[in-house]
Regions:
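N-terminal amphipathic alpha-helix/helix-capping segment at the start of soluble metabolic enzymes
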Residues: 11-13, 79, 101, 105-117, ...
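Metal- or metallocofactor-binding catalytic centers and their adjacent structured scaffolds
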Residues: 25, 30-102
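Structured beta-strand/loop patches that form or line metal/cofactor-binding pockets in enzymes
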Residues: 1-43, 309-313
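Conserved, mostly hydrophobic/aromatic
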Residues: 22, 28, 59, 91, ...
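Shared catalytic-loop signature of beta/alpha-barrel
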Residues: 196, 207-224, 229-327
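Hydrophobic faces of well-ordered beta-strands that scaffold small-molecule active sites
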Residues: 33, 120-124, 148-150, 173-177, ...
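Metal-dependent enolase-superfamily TIM-barrel catalytic cores that perform enediolate-based chemistry
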Residues: 109-219
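C-terminal extensions of enzymes
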Residues: 309, 315-356
Length: 356
């Protein structure tokens, strides 16, 4: 699927997304999941081609022919495979969607969600010029988004933030480095504190918890961890050792709803707010993100946005829209509450495999 506009981070630039969809038949009821792995292993060791192989060769054989009392039982089987959380999450999410449909209830309600609408922020990629960045922020604020996140990297950090604060002194603003810095860069990151940021997301190495602990000691601005958190155990270490004050929970990165709910509860018990990050999902993945964001400790605006921000044509109906107040209504229909557009899925499909 082709994005409406290219999206650039400190790691790479995306223009087209190859998306793996999982369609699971659970006792005659169809559930849908989406694998959020990217084209290349820059955000995560996983990427599209490896996820396909792991789903087909390892995860499917583990669940084939098994009887489950609930979707939450699937994780114990999938956990036998080390890593590959994005592939696991796609399969597990499809089973959760099917269970909610079997019970004729929304997925949000099934997982314990409490919200009828969720607060929305927006993530803006690195732009060629500051004027283009300002124009993009103006457009998103006019659309109603409650929080602005911009991507930063060395050489594109202080000046973009300074310019935005001059133009928009009162907006909720945060930055995301996607691991672009090292602990030696702490004086530069300290300078960002003068711009009253909500948080600095994943400033240091994707597997470097220790340096984040040391950095958070030096900063008053909260650190939010993303790439560092793949398991409940890593989340516990980050929270209890002081590596962060906020955690971004992504279904794909941590392996699905079962682990997401555990991390959510852990953070809630420790007074650590969470929010839902985005991975350039299609409407199916976005619907799952909406459901996840209804859990009570998702108290900060997430990266769940309107369909039209990324896709001229999406594969669900109705498309997701954002209110002028910067919120999305939670679907109340069974399962994810949005219907896959089978005609468009067929149109965009380049590879299909039927596993029985």
């Amino acid at each position: 699927m082709k994005l409406v506009a290219p999206f650039e981070t400190s790691m790479d630039r995306s223009e087209i997304r190859r998306i793996i969809l999982v369609e699971a038949n659970v006792d005659g009821v169809i559930g849908w999941g989406e694998c959020v792995a990217g084209e290349s292993p820059f955000y995560s060791p996983e990427y599209t081609d490896t996820a396909w192989l792991v789903l087909r060769n390892f995860l499917w054989p583990l669940v084939k022919g098994q009887q489950f009392k609930a979707a939450s039982d699937v994780w114990a089987l999938l956990a036998q495979v080390r890593g590959h959380n994005m592939a696991k999450a796609a399969l597990e999410a499809a089973v959760w969607d099917a269970e909610a449909k079997q019970k004729d209830m929304s997925l949000a309600k099934l997982i314990g969600g409490t919200r009828e609408e969720i607060a929305c922020g927006v993530s803006i990629g690195i732009k060629p010029s500051l004027d283009e960045l300002v124009a993009a922020v103006k457009e998103e604020l006019a659309a109603g988004y409650q929080r602005i996140k911009i991507k930063i990297k060395p050489g594109s950090d202080l000046e973009p933030v300074r310019r935005l604060r001059q133009e928009f002194p009162r907006i909720k603003l945060m930055v995301d480095a996607n691991s672009a810095y090292t602990l030696e860069d702490w004086p530069l990151l300290k300078q960002l504190e003068g711009f009253y940021l909500m948080m600095i997301e994943q400033p240091l190495g994707w597997d470097d918890l220790y340096s984040h602990i040391e950095l958070q000691k030096k900063l008053d601005t909260p650190i939010c961890l993303d790439e560092c958190i793949h398991t409940e155990e890593q989340a516990r270490a980050a929270v209890e050792l002081g590596a962060c004050k906020i955690i971004n929970i992504k279904l794909g990165r941590i392996g699905g709803y079962t682990v997401a709910r555990r991390i959510h509860d852990l953070c809630q018990d420790h007074g650590v707010p969470v929010w839902c990050g985005g991975m350039l999902e299609s409407g199916i993945g976005r619907a799952h993100n909406i459901a996840l964001s209804t859990l009570p400790n998702f108290t900060l605006p997430g990266d769940v946005t309107a369909t039209k921000r990324y896709w001229a044509e999406d594969i669900i109906s109705p498309e997701v829209t954002v209110s002028p107040q910067g919120t999305i209504r939670v679907p109340v229909g069974p399962g994810i509450g949005l219907k896959p557009r089978l005609d468009l899925i067929e149109k965009f499909t380049v590879r299909k495999e039927h596993l029985v």
